C-alpha cells in the first residue's frame, strides 16, 4: 500500500485485520484527519487476533508460554510500516491492537497521536519522529521481544499494565528532561539521551534535524525524506489536501 493520500475518514485510514500471513508493506502514505466518528483507534490501525489470541489476558499468556510457535503461525513474514506521515487527533497515529505481532515500524513522521503497542510480540519500532507525544505500551508480555529504539520522543511514556519491557527499550532521543527521567525510572533507556530537538522547518513539514546535532551525533537518529508522502502525480497532488502541522 504505497503513495496514497487518505483523510477525512470515520475510522482508520488503513486497517490491518489479523496477520494474514504478513509480508505487507505500508509506505509513503499521507494519512490524517482520521477516526472522526469513534475513539480507541488509529490512523494506521491493526488487530492481531490470530490463533494464539484470547480475550482473557491470563489465558493468552498461558497459551503463548506453552505454545510459542503459535505466535508467528499466522503472521509468518513481518509487516512493514515505513516512510509514512500520520496524524490522528482522536486516537493514535499508529495503533497496534489486540495481539498484533511481527511488525517493523521505522522512518515514520507521527504528527500528533503517538505510537501504541498493545499486547503482542516481536514489534521493532526504530527511527520514528513522534511529535508532541510518545510510546503507549499497553499490556506487554514479559517475553514480548519488542524493540523501541532511536526514536525522537517528546513526552513521558504512557504504560498501562506492562509486565515486561520487551527485548530493548533504549537508545532513544528525548526532547524533555522529565520524560527522560521518567523513562529511566521505569528501568530502561540506559543509553538514551535528552537534548534540544530543532527541526529544520516544522511549519512547512520538514522535521529533519541538522546532521551535526546531538540527535544525530549522539542519539544515532537518521534523517529520512520529508517530500515523498502521499500521491505522486501532479494532477492528484493538486487535488490532495495536507495535514495541519503541529506547533
Which stretches of residues belong to each language-model region?
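Right-handed parallel beta-helix
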Residues: 1-12, 21-36, 50-63, 75-88, ...
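Surface-exposed beta-strand edges and their flanking turn/coil or helix-capping segments
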Residues: 16, 39-41, 57-59, 94-96, ...
Amino acid at each position: 500500500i504505497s503513495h496514497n493520500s487518505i483523510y477525512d475518514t470515520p475510522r482508520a485510514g488503513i486497517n490491518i485485520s489479523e496477520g494474514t500471513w504478513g509480508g505487507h508493506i505500508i509506505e509513503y502514505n499521507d494519512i490524517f484527519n482520521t477516526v472522526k466518528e469513534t475513539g480507541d483507534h488509529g490512523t494506521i490501525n491493526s488487530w492481531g487476533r490470530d490463533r494464539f489470541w484470547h480475550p482473557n489476558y491470563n489465558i493468552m499468556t498461558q497459551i503463548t508460554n506453552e505454545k510459542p510457535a503459535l505466535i508467528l503461525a499466522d503472521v509468518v513474514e513481518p509487516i512493514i510500516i515505513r516512510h509514512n506521515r500520520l496524524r490522528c487527533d482522536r486516537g493514535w497515529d499508529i495503533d497496534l491492537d489486540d495481539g498484533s505481532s511481527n511488525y517493523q515500524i521505522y522512518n515514520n513522521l507521527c504528527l500528533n497521536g503517538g505510537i501504541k503497542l498493545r499486547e503482542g510480540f516481536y514489534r521493532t519500532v526504530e527511527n520514528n519522529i513522534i511529535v508532541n507525544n510518545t510510546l503507549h505500551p499497553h499490556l506487554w508480555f514479559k517475553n514480548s521481544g519488542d524493540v523501541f529504539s532511536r526514536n525522537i520522543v517528546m513526552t513521558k511514556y504512557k504504560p498501562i499494565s506492562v509486565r515486561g519491557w520487551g527485548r530493548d527499550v533504549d537508545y532513544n532521543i528525548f526532547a524533555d528532561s522529565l520524560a527522560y527521567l521518567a523513562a529511566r525510572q521505569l528501568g530502561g533507556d540506559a543509553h538514551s539521551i535528552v537534548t534540544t530537538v530543532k527541526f529544520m522547518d516544522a511549519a512547512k513539514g520538514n522535521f529533519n534535524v541538522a546532521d551535526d546535532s546531538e540527535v544525530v551525533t549522539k542519539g544515532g537518529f537518521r534523517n529520512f525524506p520529508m517530500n515523498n508522502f502521499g500521491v505522486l502525480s501532479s494532477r492528484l497532488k493538486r487535488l490532495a489536501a495536507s495535514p495541519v502541522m503541529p506547533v
